[in-house]
C-alpha cells in the first residue's frame, strides 16, 4: 500500500465508525458535566438550570452524543448537533474574539464540522443504522 493510494476496502468505513464512536463519547462528557457535574465544572461556575439554553444543550449533548456513538439515526442526529455547535460557536465563542484559538472555540468548530461530515457520510459499518440496513436487505 502506497501512502498516495486509498486504504484497502474495509478500513475507511471501520475508521469512520471509530471516529463516530470517539466523537460521541467525548461529546457525552460535555453534557454530563452540565447535567450531573461529572466531571466537575470549573470552580466558580454556577449550577446549570435544566430548562436554560445551556441545560437543553447538555440534554442534547448526552442523548445526541449517545445516539451518535451508537450510530442510531446518525444523519439526523449529526445534522442537529452540527447546527447546535454552530450556534454555540457564534453565540458564545465568536463574540470574545475572531480567532478560535483565542476564544476557546476550537472544540465547537471541530465538533460542528465532524457532525456535518457525518450528515453526508452516514455512520459507518459498525453502527445500529448499518445493522438496521442489513436486516432490511435480508428481508427483501
Identify the residue ranges that each predicted region occupies.
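Perimembrane loop-to-helix junctions flanking transmembrane segments
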Residues: 42-55
Amino acid at each position: 500500500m502506497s501512502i498516495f493510494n486509498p486504504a484497502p476496502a474495509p478500513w475507511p468505513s471501520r475508521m469512520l465508525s471509530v471516529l463516530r464512536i470517539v466523537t460521541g463519547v467525548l461529546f457525552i462528557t460535555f453534557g454530563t458535566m452540565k447535567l450531573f457535574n461529572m466531571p466537575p465544572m470549573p470552580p466558580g461556575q454556577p449550577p446549570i438550570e435544566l430548562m436554560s439554553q445551556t441545560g437543553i444543550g447538555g440534554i442534547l449533548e448526552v442523548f445526541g452524543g449517545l445516539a451518535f456513538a451508537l450510530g442510531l439515526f446518525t444523519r439526523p442526529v449529526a445534522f442537529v448537533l452540527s447546527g447546535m455547535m454552530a450556534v454555540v460557536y457564534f453565540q458564545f465563542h465568536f463574540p470574545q474574539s475572531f480567532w478560535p484559538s483565542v476564544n476557546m472555540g476550537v472544540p465547537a468548530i471541530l465538533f460542528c464540522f465532524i457532525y456535518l461530515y457525518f450528515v453526508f457520510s452516514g455512520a459507518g459499518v459498525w453502527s445500529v443504522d448499518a445493522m438496521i440496513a442489513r436486516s432490511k436487505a435480508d428481508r427483501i
